[in-house]
Structures are given as C-alpha cells and as structure tokens.
Design a protein with these regions (language model features):
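A structural signal for short coil/turn segments at secondary-structure junctions
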Residues: 88-89, 123, 194
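PRPP/pyrophosphate-binding module of the type I phosphoribosyltransferase fold
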Residues: 141-215
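Active-site-facing substrate-recognition patch
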Residues: 4-90, 101-109, 131-166
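Substrate-recognition/cap helix-loop segment adjacent to the acidic, metal-dependent catalytic center
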Residues: 107-125
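Anionic group-transfer/hydrolysis microenvironments
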Residues: 98
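N-terminal cationic-hydrophobic initiation segments that often serve targeting/anchoring roles
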Residues: 82-86, 120, 191
Length: 215
C-alpha cells in the first residue's frame, strides 16, 4: 500500500499551542493528527485539503464521475495511518467515529470503519463500531449552530454486543478534528461504559484557520 499524500510519518500531539483551535478539548485529552486542513479553502489549496474533501464525499455522489476519488482517498488515508502506526497493529481497540447518519439510512457512510480495516488487511486489528448514532442528524457543516458535546452525546449509544472483551486502550479515529466536540462526546460515552479505559484520539488532519482570514 502506498500513499502520494505528503503526510508526516508520525502523528503530532495536540498541545497548549494548538488546543485553542479545538476549544472543546480539555487539557487531559490526548489527541494526535497527521496533516492540517485549512478551513475555507478548496481541493486545490493543499494535498491534505484534497484528501479530506474527497474522503468526505457524500454517498449521494455515488455513481458520479468523481466517486472514484473517494475510494482513492480512503486507500491513501489507510496508507498514511499504516506508515505512522507501523506494519503491525498496536494492542488498541480502534473505534471509528460514527457518521451523522444512523445505520439503515441510505446516506450512512462507514468510511472510517472501511479505512481502519484497510490499514492492516488480513491482520488481527481490533476494529469495533462501539459507538452507534441512534438517529440521523444533519452533518455539522449543514447546521446553523455547531452542536455541543452534550447534544452530540445524546444521540450516541454503546453497541453492547461488541463490548467484550472489555477494551483497555481505545483509539477513537476520525478524519478531521474541528472543535473537538465529537471527540468529547465519544470519549464521554465510552468512559461511562468502560470506566477504566484509556482513550486517545487519532485524526487524519486537524482544521486550522485560514491565515489570510486572521489578517
């Protein structure tokens, strides 16, 4: 598996300098990212922007000429994770962030699960859809006001059929870290069910403000 995306070979940890960009994160949250996605810019702005936007293509684009780029982005994302995490899966339970659409919804997009399973094909990586979206909601970028962690958590539940063996370390995996609200919601619902679990977040990219908008 190869990748032509200029991601670093290692994850970078969110620290005191970058945490203000993701204001729902707490000092105790351990989150790591590979690339930086520039808000308000399009596909051509950077390789990371191109990958994230292709990866996030809605299922209503299926069958269109551009659909091929979603699958290509998925494989590129998996290759980048493999390069950063190593050729053998660590002893974590990898939990994909649930999409905004519930299971059974025609627009339910399991891209994070498929990406995780593509990192170590044929290996024994522990990938579990532990967190389930109980009802479909609008994607965050389609909502006039960004939801709080509590509002997001209200639609989450644990799939208890996947809860054993109980995880010791959970990596919540998502494509883009924005405000941190989804990570906080996912962390809270996992910690309530597994009080002793250690939780980290792994992201393809973090959102950064457009430098020109700050001038």
């Amino acid at each position: 598996m190869t990748s032509d995306v200029a991601f670093p070979d290692r994850f970078t940890e969110i620290d005191e300098l970058t945490r203000p960009d993701h204001y729902w994160l707490t000092d105790d949250d351990r989150c790591y990212f590979l690339g930086e996605y520039t808000a308000g810019r399009g596909y051509s702005y950077s390789q990371t922007n191109q990958l994230i936007l292709n990866f996030k293509k809605s299922l209503d684009r299926q069958g269109k000429p551009e659909w091929q780029y979603k699958q290509s982005a998925l494989l590129q994302a998996a290759a980048s994770f493999r390069r950063a995490l190593g050729k053998d899966p660590p002893a974590h339970v990898f939990v994909p962030m649930p999409p905004s659409k519930a299971r059974g919804d025609p627009l339910h997009d399991d891209r994070m699960t498929r990406m995780l399973r593509a990192i170590w094909p044929g290996e024994s990586a522990d990938v579990r859809e532990l967190i389930v979206q109980s009802e479909s909601t609008d994607a965050v970028h389609e909502q006039p006001v960004r939801p709080t962690p509590e509002q997001i958590q209200a639609a989450y539940r644990i799939d208890t059929s996947l809860a054993t063996p109980e995880p010791r370390i959970v990596s919540i995996v998502d494509d883009l870290l924005t405000t941190g609200a989804h990570f906080r919601a996912a962390s809270s619902v996992l910690a309530a069910h597994f009080p002793a679990v250690q939780i980290i977040g792994l992201f393809l990219a973090r959102r950064v403000p457009d430098a020109e908008s700050l001038l």
